[in-house]
Amino acid sequence: MNQKLLFIDRDGTLITEPPTDFQVDRLDKLALETEVIPALLALQKSGFRLIMITNQDGLGTDSFPLEQFEPPHNLMMQIFSSQGIHFDEVLICPHKPEENCHCRKPKIKLVEKYLTEGLMDTANSYVIGDRETDLQLAKNMGIQGLHYHPKNLGWFAICEQLTRQDRHAHVQRITKETSINIDVWLDHEGSSDINTGVGFFDHMLDQIATHGGFRMHVQVKGDLCIDDHHTVEDTGLALGEALKLALGDKRGICRFGFVLPMDECLARCALDISGRPHLEYKAEFKHQRVGDLSTEMIEHFFRSLSYAMACTLHLKTKGSNDHHRAESLFKAFGRTLRQAIRVEGDTLPSSKGVL
């Protein structure tokens, strides 16, 4: 399973690097970098696995005997462990630059298995270090690098950057009938830009975003010269996929939502972002169209969305006006979605360990 990994340098990043000889070879030289413990705890809590990777010039030789290296290193590891911080691995290159080995950063020998065995979520893994060699290692690994500096980019700033919610997804779907581009920002409210070519459908999609508490851009070009079938269906598929991607690993979300708004129409919506697609839908309309939207396509839209989003969705409405009945379904779904995508913690809301 791909995991979010942090490859963290030791000297100058986790602990202070002595400016005189650049070796932590005595206990009195050991000092943790500011805020490193609370930052690592928060990063672990948000789902990152920690791997230490360090160059230790001449380790095990007369210039840097093991008996000088081990006491401060072991104490550092004990301190981290006592505070609940655990490293999956500690990767050490003991060679000097002139030995031209294959394991010294920024070369990738030490991290090869993470690149070849599918263990790493490359889009959400980072190298953190205080030297250019750390940034070059990140580049060689095909992941992002963060240049640690206690004043310019310290541990608090790194933690804030990596744990900040920014659930965004972009989906492009192109077929012979439609061309669709959708962007979804689940943690940002504001004006949405929606243009499907079907005015009433645009209004309904805006209801989802407005009542869902998020922002989206939807641009659709479809074969409306025939009818609205492909436009509505494919938009449902693309929007469902975008919502699923934006939710990511779903860690911390409420998962469930239920709403029963009562106005002229009585609409009911229940939602479970379960990974199991299913739709129960009950709505009757007097007319074939509401504005320029076919009423039969409303069910088709929600069915496409629920299957692409991999969620279980129950929708039901009663009322006397077709416009209000249709609108109540989209509003109810938006309000329910708002509940279900809200982040309240950092655990996965499933006893199975996966959604």
Curated annotation (Swiss-Prot):
Main location: cytoplasm
Classification via SUPFAM superfamilies: HAD-like, Ribosomal protein S5 domain 2-like
Pathway(s) served: Amino-acid biosynthesis; L-histidine biosynthesis; L-histidine from 5-phospho-alpha-D-ribose 1-diphosphate: step 6/9; Amino-acid biosynthesis; L-histidine biosynthesis; L-histidine from 5-phospho-alpha-D-ribose 1-diphosphate: step 8/9
Organism taxonomic ancestry: Bacteria, Pseudomonadati, Pseudomonadota, Gammaproteobacteria, Enterobacterales
Recorded catalytic activity of this chain's protein: D-erythro-1-(imidazol-4-yl)glycerol 3-phosphate = 3-(imidazol-4-yl)-2-oxopropyl phosphate + H2O; L-histidinol phosphate + H2O = L-histidinol + phosphate
Active site residues of this protein: D9 (nucleophile), D11 (proton donor)
Keywords associated with the record: Amino-acid biosynthesis, Cytoplasm, Histidine biosynthesis, Hydrolase, Lyase, Magnesium, Metal-binding, Multifunctional enzyme, Zinc
Disulfide bonds: none
Entry keyword annotation includes Amino-acid biosynthesis: yes
Family membership noted in the UniProt record: In the N-terminal section; belongs to the histidinol-phosphatase family.
Gene Ontology terms, MF aspect: histidinol-phosphatase activity; imidazoleglycerol-phosphate dehydratase activity; metal ion binding
Superkingdom field: Bacteria
Residues annotated for Mg(2+) binding in this entry: D9, D11, D130
Region (Histidinol-phosphatase): 1-166
Pfam families per UniProt: Hydrolase_like, IGPD
InterPro entries: HAD-like_sf, HAD-SF_hydro_IIIA, HAD_sf, His_synth_bifunc_HisB, HisB_N, Histidinol-phos, IGPD_sf, ImidazoleglycerolP_deHydtase
Cofactor(s) recorded in Swiss-Prot or TrEMBL: Mg(2+); Zn(2+)
Compartments, record wording: Cytoplasm
Binding residue positions for Zn(2+): C93, H95, C101, C103
Name of the protein: Histidine biosynthesis bifunctional protein HisB
GO cellular component terms, A-Z: cytoplasm
